[in-house]
Curated annotation (Swiss-Prot):
Superkingdom of the organism of origin: Viruses
Name of protein: Non-structural protein 1, peptide 1
Keywords: Host membrane, Membrane, Transmembrane, Transmembrane helix
Protein family membership: Belongs to the rotavirus B NSP1-1 family.
GO cellular component: host cell membrane; membrane
Location(s) in or outside the cell: Host membrane
Membrane topology: Single-pass membrane protein
């Protein structure tokens, strides 16, 4: 259960000695910066990978739901349903609107 040491070599040794509760902690400032940058880099890569996976999943789910919605609630299924109810001789006028739903009126 020891700490892993970095293999980075330092040319200038600038050390900070902190004394807390009679214990001496010696740390090198460049090593601390190197570890912080490494942690930030690893966290950034992890966050970016997670966001890309979420984007891919949402695109796939969106395509699936759009296809399913078009099949079940699309204009063709509404026309077929209306033809089955009123018979094939009924005249159907589809009024275009700028919304997601389509209004069907009989002429």
């Amino acid at each position: 259960m020891g700490n892993r040491q970095s293999s980075a070599q330092l040319n200038s040794h600038l050390t900070h000695i902190n004394s807390q509760n009679s214990n001496l902690f010696i740390s090198d400032s460049k090593t601390a910066v190197f570890h912080t940058q490494h942690i930030l880099l690893a966290a950034g890569v992890g966050i970016i990978a997670t966001l890309l996976v979420l984007l891919l999943c949402s695109c796939v789910l969106n395509c699936y739901l759009c296809r399913r919605l078009k099949r079940t609630n699309g204009v063709s299924s509404l026309l077929e349903r209306n033809l089955r109810q009123n018979g094939s001789s009924a005249k159907i006028y589809v009024k275009p609107v700028m919304q997601s739903s389509t209004i069907i009126e009989e002429a």
